Amino acid sequence: LLHDIGHYPFSHTLEELMPFFVLHEERARQIILDPSRSINRVLRNEFDLDPVSVANVIDYRNKSVDIPRRHLLLANILSGTLDPDKIDYLLRDSLFCGVPFGESVNRDRLITSIKYDPSGKRLAITSKGVSAVEALVFTNYQMYRNVYWHHTVRSATAMFKRAVQDVLSHSSCQLRLDDFHGISESELILMLREEQRRLGLEGAALLLEGTVSRRLHKLGSFISPGERKRELLQFFYDLY
């Protein structure tokens, strides 16, 4: 229930703008371990749980923390190739985007086929569940190829990130990380508009309004892996 507690609006996009933003898993650790927050008190008093253990399961990739092996196993259930979050959002996104990729995934077969392997102290899948796993993996590939990484989505993402980056990198920016928590996506956009107006960032304002109103940049060129890839990428970096 708490694995997404560290999310802020557009966080999968904004957390790429490091070091201003932190990963939502790291933010979840900060929230859960804060003794002044109700979540910390409820975990200790109502559920008799150690908040550190809960934070370890969520923020298991944190290199600055020594994560016990038993917590890594639970983290593998929560966030892995077959985690419930992935099973949920891939099928749901497929349905609401009107693409058929999620229809081939047998969710019930997938869940019942997941077992614990005591020899390796890890999750395993029975032979009957192999086809269900393959369907999920292929669905994941198809969703990224055709939806998540579609050039229209990438255009909107790039425009929004640049609009935010121009604000945050300004020497007179007054926004802080905590300003992005506990607000809705609409409130975040209003906050950015106000800061762009105050700082006089007309270019960033145009990018933000273009994203909101779907006036997106068009595909200018397509670069495939090859000998000129580094040269072309450097050209675009120098251009901007």
What is each of the regions a protein language model found here?
Residues L1:
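Alpha-helical phosphate/pyrophosphate-handling elements in metalloenzyme active cores
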Residues I5, P9-Y240:
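Histidine-centered, transition-metal-coordinating active-site segments
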